[in-house]
Amino acid sequence: MMKLYIVFGFIAFSAAYVVPEGYYEPEYYPADGYESERVARASPAELIFDEDLADEPEVEEPQYYIRTRRSLQPGAPNFPMPGSQLPTSITSNIEKQGPNTAATINAQHKTDRYDVGATWSKVIRGPGRSKPNWSIGGTYRW
């Protein structure tokens, strides 16, 4: 209970403490940017009505940049789509297998001379959680 009174006393003291008026007043600089001519102890309201500030240069327009986003939607760039003519295809799948949730990633590269495939799978949630399984295989046609 005594700790509560001490904490309450600190809060009351900090709320009642008076800060001197000029203690937190920042120094303002003229609008032309010269730091050597400081306007000492001027309030923002006084600076607004200053005649020197009326001739401020115009503010430049912000520059906008457009970033093309990658997307998995059909027709998006940089991703092989199902049924496309690219020799490489990558598919992923997350599915529920009883009480377990399994993730699978398949990658295949097919040409007229060889086929290469890789598979990675892991049970990510459930009682059958384990280390990932992976396999890599390939065939070469003579």
UniProtKB/Swiss-Prot annotation:
Keywords: Antibiotic, Antimicrobial, Cleavage on pair of basic residues, Immunity, Innate immunity, Secreted, Signal. It is found in: Secreted. The keyword Metal-binding does not apply. It comes from the Eukaryota. Residues 17-70 form a propeptide. Pfam families: Coleoptericin. This is Rhinocerosin. It comes from Oryctes rhinoceros (Coconut rhinoceros beetle).
